[in-house]
A protein has these predicted regions:
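Post-HExxH zinc-binding segment in Zn-dependent metallohydrolases
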Residues: 98-128
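Zn2+-dependent metallopeptidase catalytic core
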Residues: 11-29
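A short, surface-exposed helix-loop junction/capping segment
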Residues: 1-9
Length: 148
C-alpha cells in the first residue's frame, strides 16, 4: 500500500476524532457546531470571518460556525481557535468578558494546545506564524475591548 494513502487516512481519522469529540463537548453546553462550504462565513453583524462563536443565551443555543471551504489545516486552526473562546466563556475568564486583543491571543494559545493534544495534521511552525500574523493584523485594526 502507498504510504501517502496510509498517512492521509491516519490524519483523516485524527480529524474525524477531533470533530466528533468537539460535537460531544459542545452539545453538553447547548452549543451546536456548523460547517459551511464557503471560504468565509457571515456573522450576525454582517462581518466576513473564517469562523465565529456565539454563546448560548436563555433558551437559544450557542453556535460555532466554521468556513470549511479552505484547506483542512486552516479550518482546523479556526475550529481550535473558536474552542478557545468557548473555554473562555465556560470558565468565565476575564479575557472573555473584556474581549479584544487579549481574548484573541488567549484563543490562539488554546488552539495551539488543542492541535498538539489531538495530534492534528497542522504544522506547528506554520500555525505559529499564522497566529503571529493574525495578532499583528488585529493590532493594526480598530479592535476594541468588549469586541469578540
Amino acid at each position: 500500500m502507498n504510504t501517502k494513502f496510509i498517512k492521509h487516512h491516519i490524519e483523516q481519522n485524527r480529524v474525524d476524532t477531533f470533530v466528533k469529540y468537539t460535537r460531544r463537548y459542545l452539545k453538553r453546553m447547548n452549543i451546536r457546531l456548523e460547517f459551511r462550504q464557503g471560504a468565509t462565513v457571515r456573522t450576525e453583524d454582517g462581518e466576513s470571518a473564517e469562523g465565529f462563536f456565539y454563546e448560548p443565551e436563555g433558551k437559544d443555543k450557542g453556535v460555532i460556525v466554521i468556513a470549511k471551504g479552505r484547506p483542512r489545516r486552516e479550518w482546523l486552526t479556526t475550529l481550535a481557535h473558536e474552542l478557545g473562546h468557548v473555554n473562555q466563556w465556560l470558565t468565565e475568564d476575564v479575557v472573555w468578558s473584556k474581549g479584544g486583543l487579549p481574548a484573541e491571543r488567549d484563543a490562539e494559545n488554546h488552539s495551539q494546545k488543542l492541535i498538539k493534544k489531538f495530534n492534528l495534521p497542522v504544522d506547528a511552525r506554520w500555525h505559529k506564524i499564522q497566529s503571529k500574523k493574525y495578532i499583528s493584523f488585529l493590532k493594526k485594526t480598530p479592535y476594541t475591548d468588549n469586541e469578540r
